[in-house]
């Protein structure tokens, strides 16, 4: 939380919190909290920080991944403030957050877990400093930074010098209207390799869009570093992750572009969708420099599905509609906290791109997703839904000497009224192939209502009735090499 000092000093044991795509973190659901560790009072030598994605922080649709057009629609905006003050939890701030979300008992527990993580991190740092002394601890920390920098420079030096360009696009501006013209949103990159230094320039990228696909610079830089680390791990076998990795790297992003919008542009999907396309263009550019290393494009989307509503009288639920006991909070036993609402957010895997070494993996999360499969049993136990189908989408991987991985089919039936939002990409153009390989199959979305099959665009918000089925087919990965 770089600007926490604009609010008040951070004292030992105090935690500041921030969650807002326009104020330093990636999107409103990604709440960051930064306490100081008790190692050195003025200023703190280390901070034990955490950032967690919360499944709902309010906003215009359950799951806080709406088809938004401005930041204010995406959930509560938390400026830098004290969540823990003088060693005590600030219950006024805590209550303000809980009253602005659909599932306050979940947020209560998740926020408490973040604070517990801080306490553990601070204790471990204090233990190290107590054992070795603060000066030696700082010396070793600086050595780790220098080691990561030297490895990063060594990896860059193994990439042939040159300027490598690539372009790909998002399907649309994120508004989700299938009647709108097919106007892709281009993302362009030039990767300039010079000795041990790397410059990644996104000049020529599209301006900020009306929808929520705008990404903040922190997202773009993280995606670039992810690509660089993948290359370094492949070339060198190791690369620790710390600020030293950034030292030989320069990232240039046009202000006002879809990769650096001005507030209050919407940014909810920048983290989950636009980041995937940033990875695709950076890898696409590096493929010209490292053709025997870089794979074809993976599915290029997280296939975000959020839904929520009120449980009501759902078979298997308790009389009050609750399936879980709320934890202790400043609101208990406030009826607001006990409201029988639910909100859920998941991402769905797809096909990985094939590469020079072999076929792509099928039915996996790729690149920036950072999530895992949700088990069907846990999902059906926790929410008023039934998973009707969950299978590989055979034949969706792009053909080539090596075939791209297959996407997935996931169909979910709703047992009670709900509001759902799908935020998906690669529905109009499939993931690219490389070295003559074919593109993977684009994804498809549909609503099944009775005997009717309603095709859906890549982005949509739906008012669902009991019995409705959301049907998602995720993209396959691109193929690599000329098909045999």
Regions found by a protein language model. Give the residues of each.
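Glycine/proline-enriched, intrinsically flexible loops and inter-domain linkers
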Residues: 1-14, 44-199, 203-312, 334-484
């Amino acid at each position: 939380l770089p600007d926490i000092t604009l609010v008040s000093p951070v004292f030992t044991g105090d935690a500041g919190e921030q969650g807002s795509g326009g104020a330093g973190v990636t999107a409103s659901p990604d709440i960051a909290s930064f306490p100081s560790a008790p190692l050195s009072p003025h200023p703190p030598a280390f901070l034990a920080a955490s950032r967690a994605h919360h499944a709902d922080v309010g906003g215009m649709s359950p799951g806080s991944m709406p088809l938004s057009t401005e930041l204010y629609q995406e959930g509560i905006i938390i400026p830098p403030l004290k969540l823990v003050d003088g060693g005590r939890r600030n219950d006024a701030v805590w209550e303000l957050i809980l009253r602005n979300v659909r599932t306050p008992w979940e947020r209560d527990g998740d926020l408490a877990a973040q604070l517990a993580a801080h306490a553990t991190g601070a204790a471990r740092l204090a233990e190290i400093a107590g054992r070795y002394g603060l000066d030696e601890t700082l010396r070793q920390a600086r050595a780790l930074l220098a080691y990561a920098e030297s490895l990063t420079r060594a990896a860059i030096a193994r990439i042939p010098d040159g300027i490598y360009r690539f372009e790909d696009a998002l399907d649309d501006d994120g508004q989700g209207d299938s009647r709108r013209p097919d106007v892709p949103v281009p993302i362009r990159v030039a990767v300039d390799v010079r000795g041990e230094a790397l410059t990644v320039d996104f000049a020529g990228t599209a301006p900020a869009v009306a929808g929520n696909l705008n990404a903040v610079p922190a997202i773009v830089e993280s995606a670039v570093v992810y690509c660089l680390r993948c290359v370094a791990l492949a070339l060198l076998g190791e690369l620790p992750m710390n600020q030293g990795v950034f030292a030989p790297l320069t990232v240039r992003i046009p202000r006002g572009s879809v990769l650096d919008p001005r507030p209050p542009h919407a940014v909810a999907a920048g983290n989950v969708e636009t980041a995937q396309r940033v990875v695709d263009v950076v890898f696409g550019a590096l493929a010209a420099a490292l053709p025997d290393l870089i794979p074809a494009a993976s599915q290029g989307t997280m296939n975000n599905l959020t839904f929520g509503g009120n449980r009501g009288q759902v078979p298997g639920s308790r009389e009050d509609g609750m399936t879980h006991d709320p934890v202790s909070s400043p609101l208990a036993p406030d009826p607001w906290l006990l409201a029988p609402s639910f909100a859920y957010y998941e991402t769905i895997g797809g096909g990985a791109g094939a590469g020079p070494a072999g076929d792509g993996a099928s039915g996996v999360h790729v690149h920036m997703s950072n999530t895992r499969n949700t088990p069907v049993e846990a999902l059906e136990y926790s929410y008023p839904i039934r998973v009707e189908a969950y299978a590989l989408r055979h034949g969706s991987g792009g053909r080539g000497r090596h075939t791209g991985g297959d996407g997935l089919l996931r169909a979910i039936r709703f047992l009670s009224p709900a509001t759902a939002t799908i935020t998906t990409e690669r529905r109009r153009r499939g993931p690219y192939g490389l070295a003559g390989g074919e593109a993977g199959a684009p994804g498809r979305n549909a609503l099944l209502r009775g005997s009717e099959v309603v095709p859906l665009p890549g982005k949509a918000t739906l008012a669902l009735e009991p019995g409705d089925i959301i049907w998602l087919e995720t993209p396959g990965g691109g193929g690599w090499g000329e098909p045999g």
